Regions:
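Conserved C-terminal beta-signal and adjacent last beta-strands/turns
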Residues: 60, 65, 73-82, 111-181
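Outer membrane beta-barrel strand-and-loop segments of large Gram-negative receptors
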Residues: 4-76
Length: 181
C-alpha cells in the first residue's frame, strides 16, 4: 500500500495567458478584434497573448496505490484525486486602478481568460491480471460547477439552470498479451 498526500501552492507573476475570445466579445462585441460577415454574423475573433499580473493557485493531491499478488492473479487498485481550493486571478473593477483577486474554482469562468475549473477531479483504476489477460475498470469523476452568467427566462422555463452537473464515466477493458515471433 502506497499513500501520498501533497498540499501545493503556486504563485505566478506575469504569467503569459491567451485572451479568451468570449471575454473579448463580452467587452466589445463590435471591436477591432471581431470579424463579422455582411449579415452581422460572427466569423472570427482575433486573440493574442498578454502578461497576467499574477495568479495564485492552491490545491491538494491524494493518491492511493494497492497491489496484491495471489494464486488467482495480480490485483491492482489506485485512486488519484486533485482538489483545487484556489485559482485566484485579477479582475479589474470599473474605475479602479487596482484589480481584485477572484477565486475561479467551481465556476464556468465565461468572463475570465481561463477555462472552467471544477473543484474536484478523481480517477480510479482497478485491474486483475491472470495468465496473459488483464481486465480493467477505470472511472473518472469531474465535479460540477456553476455558470454565473444569467440565463433567459425562456431557458429556465424549459428546466435549464446555471449549474453544470458533475459526471462519472466508467471505462472497461480487456487486454491480452502475446509474443510475436
Amino acid at each position: 500500500i502506497d499513500l501520498t498526500l501533497d498540499y501545493w501552492t503556486i504563485n505566478y507573476k506575469n504569467r503569459i495567458e491567451v485572451e479568451s475570445a468570449q471575454v473579448i466579445l463580452n467587452n466589445n462585441p463590435n471591436g477591432a478584434s471581431i470579424t463579422r460577415n455582411q449579415f452581422g454574423e460572427l466569423i472570427a475573433v482575433s486573440t493574442s497573448y498578454f502578461n497576467e499580473e499574477r495568479t495564485e493557485v492552491e490545491g491538494l493531491d491524494i493518491a492511493l496505490n494497492i497491489f496484491k499478488s495471489t494464486q488467482y492473479g495480480d490485483f491492482s487498485y489506485s485512486i488519484k484525486a486533485t482538489e483545487l481550493s484556489e485559482f485566484l486571478t485579477p479582475e479589474d473593477t470599473d474605475g479602479d486602478e487596482r484589480s481584485i483577486m477572484v477565486n475561479r474554482v467551481g465556476k464556468f469562468n465565461y468572463d475570465a481568460n481561463t477555462h472552467s475549473l471544477p473543484k474536484l477531479r478523481l480517477n480510479s483504476f482497478l485491474s486483475w491480471t491472470i495468465n496473459n489477460l488483464t481486465f480493467g475498470i477505470n472511472s473518472r469523476y469531474l465535479d460540477g460547477y456553476s455558470n454565473e452568467r444569467s440565463i433567459p427566462s425562456s431557458a429556465t422555463s424549459l428546466g435549464y439552470t446555471n449549474q453544470i452537473k458533475s459526471f462519472l464515466v466508467h471505462d472497461f477493458s480487456i487486454t491480452k498479451s502475446f509474443q510475436l515471433r
